[in-house]
From Swiss-Prot:
InterPro entries reported in the protein's UniProt record: Pyrokinin_CS
Subcellular locations according to the entry: Secreted
GO terms (BP aspect): neuropeptide signaling pathway
Name of the molecule in the record: CAPA-Pyrokinin
UniProt GO MF annotations: neuropeptide hormone activity
Amino acid sequence: SSGGGDGSGMWFGPRL
C-alpha cells in the first residue's frame, strides 16, 4: 500500500 501499510492491506500514517 502507498503511504503506509502493515502489509495486510491496512493503512496507518500521514496518508489515510
